[in-house]
Regions:
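Core of compact, soluble alpha-helical bundle domains
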Residues: 1-128
Length: 128
């Protein structure tokens, strides 16, 4: 068990696909976040995030094979991401993670990562 990746422990590709589908179902209805996603159809964003998370957590490196290095900050720089957007994003991702039947250690690893990563994407000053 100690040698298994979070990808494997979470249930593999199926789990990550489901998590991302649930996340984007919420994003699609969120007026704060829709402006961050320029595509009307979120299927491209869904595929990219799924592939990224699968790779990040120890699954196949399909994301890098197709898109190169993730460069998260650079890829998100064109979009205005402030604390409001970060909080909305994290709320939807937390709900998606918590909707899954995951071991507590896996859930904690995912949520800790999403909190850190989403905070790192903030590129706008605090609004007064």
């Amino acid at each position: 068990m100690l040698n298994r990746s979070v990808y494997e422990l979470a249930g593999g590709e199926r789990t990550f696909k489901l998590m991302v589908e649930r996340f984007y179902a919420r994003v699609a209805k969120d007026p704060v976040l829709r402006s961050v996603y320029p595509e009307e159809d979120l299927s491209g964003a869904t595929e990219r995030l799924t592939l990224f998370l699968i790779q990040y957590w120890g699954g196949p490196a399909t994301y890098s094979e197709r898109r190169g290095h993730p460069r998260l900050r650079l890829r998100h720089q064109p979009f205005a991401i402030g604390h409001l957007e970060r909080d909305a994003w994290l709320s939807h991702m937390t709900a998606a993670v918590e909707s899954l039947d995951l071991a507590p250690a896996v859930r904690t690893a995912l949520l800790d990562y999403f909190e850190t990563a989403s905070t790192a994407m903030i590129n706008q000053p605090v609004r007064s």
